[in-house]
């Protein structure tokens, strides 16, 4: 046991290998010690090997079935790994041992709920309520949350009538009044009690007249459909009744523009535009650009605003009128659906001349965006920097400027710009602080800039940082398995669990993964790309920069060592970055195996994204795994059979009966998907040929 405890201490000091060796020795000396097995599980948990940790915990429980600590640690890991059936058993044991703790009852209900047993979850919560001899006080938020959680379980089981009856007692007592009202309206609508549902949604709109979900619910209760022209007159009258209640409300004036057509749309758009232009609302175009998918609406808006621009301003329109109209037209002609950059530049220059403020950078920002769309990234970055200098205390324009600098491949300048708003004392400088803040947009843009410059090591470093951030998000939920139960925030905890299950559907993960996969495919096709494509001058510059960063890294290392020597038990010493340039990432002997680390989550969580399937094809076909490649190709074809990349990949796979892929020094981006081929070293097995032929016959 002493050896096991020493192993635990060594692990906390970062000596993981030594800790495991000592823990194994402890097990060898005392195989039947529950402490040794528990510590062994804790070591595996610290290295994120949850499966082995669970095995160790279970073995420890066999030796000491009454250990609450081991049982608790096991239950937390079962929640982390989504072993809901195992969690039910663990929570039942814990509840039996400590039935007086409310958190144990709640945890048991959650386990049943997540396992899909709604009836058992409700029963557990009811049993606890029956054990209460004194009703909880009105200030007991944990009780109110548990009761509302029980109501949502009943609703999820499909028994909306009983859930609705339960809400009646909650309305006056539950502090989350809005949630109760929303659930009541939802239940009434599902039960087809439309008159009561209409009243419920109108009450919600009295509380928040800008919430579009409430308007959608109200439309359903009235049997109105935006896609049905016969309903448009009634819908227009409905929204007018809400708009007339207050001049400040925007939603009932904006929503009708989505479904109105023809003259009715022109009249409503005219009224809406006149109202917002008189106020000088800068976000008007952002609020209306969704309408541009309808060609007739786009033309109507253009005609109306051009008409405003041609008229002389009057006192009724106010002093902001000309400024707002010209700014709208600048954004209008910059938008990709009606792009005319010459006109956009003309209107933005006129807008800037009308703007008396020397600190309002809004119009200068749009000018830089127009320049960017013209293709002059260097001028756009300079213009955005000029906009930044108009208000040096504004973080948003500072961030925007850094993004434009990255688009212009000015990585060093961009990090200096970002450094104006990062902590000066942060380890690793501005980049280290951005990593701590998990600033994914910067890491992605920085990686893309390095990728364009053929600095693939640094690019991979940035994309891997994003990959690691999602790992951190996944690991962070571990603490909430116990924290949320202690605090009684049950519904938020369940929402978090469901959100974590789809974590890697996040667009930032997908974008970083596609770029990383593309680089690894290039490394497989042509390993010499790891050396980059730099001129002698660029190489000297890179070497000089590397030396400076190495010196800085050594200084940081010494500082970290000094901090470690004087650190207390509460101090956290950051891990040293041994590969700041990403050189080790480029030296991988199996690029496709590294690509699979990014690809597997994509195929699991974003299978409906055609880029995921196309990336999967490129990786699998190079690994000569033709059936998985075929599966990706079929999935991509179902998403969009007319996609050019799908057709090219289909043609390539049809040649696999006679040809195989070999490395090419001219591999292009994944979106090009063009690869050279030569004769097969070995013929494909007959069964694989048959499957490929059968599936390919169904593809265009």
Describe each PLM feature range:
Residues 1-700:
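Non-TPR docking regions that flank or precede TPR/alpha-solenoid scaffolds in eukaryotic proteins
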